[in-house]
Amino acid sequence: MEEMLNSNGVILINSFIYFTSEEKKELEEKFEKNNMKIFYLEQRGIRNSIFEGMEIILNNNLVNMLVGGLLMPVAYDILKTSLVRIVNKIKNSNGKIIRAHRAPEPVNAMIKIKMDAGEIIASIEQEISIEEVEKYIQAFVKAYEIANNTPNGKNQYFIVDKTSDNNLEILLLPDYLEKHNKI
């Protein structure tokens, strides 16, 4: 568990239905060549969240390197292309979220960063390009800086949300819920 949290890495939760053994091995090799790791976790049980989908968690050490500009260009490119591949694989799958009294819905990819100040979450509802991943990474870095400069900023949720003109904005959870009529 410590390696998962302290290495430069990405954690995929409940990805077993989206990737073959060969695809997992290929991703692992790409990451390892650049001193990064990719981990696959399975979580069972009922989940209750306003953000449902397959989680892609960028671990703390990787985020610190992104924020500090210390991630080598080749490793940064591997991260971007891997995120594109992972998100698009999820979006092109036949996976569905099934809830009582509702029609099945396509699975979204959720990129998350967990930190002392809370979480940064981006729910991605469509295929994504390298350029869009770069925008998301820049928004994550900005949200991380905001979170760490907020007095008494513990346990806050920062949501990276796509606007109608395809830009990204950073919202606190109450603002996001209000914007999307969820409260």
Region spans (language model):
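Short, glycine/alanine-rich hydrophobic alpha-helices that insert into or span membranes
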Residues: 59, 63-75
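Short amphipathic alpha-helical segments that predominantly mediate membrane engagement
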Residues: 1-59, 83-183
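Short hydrophobic alpha-helical membrane-entry/anchor segments
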Residues: 70-86
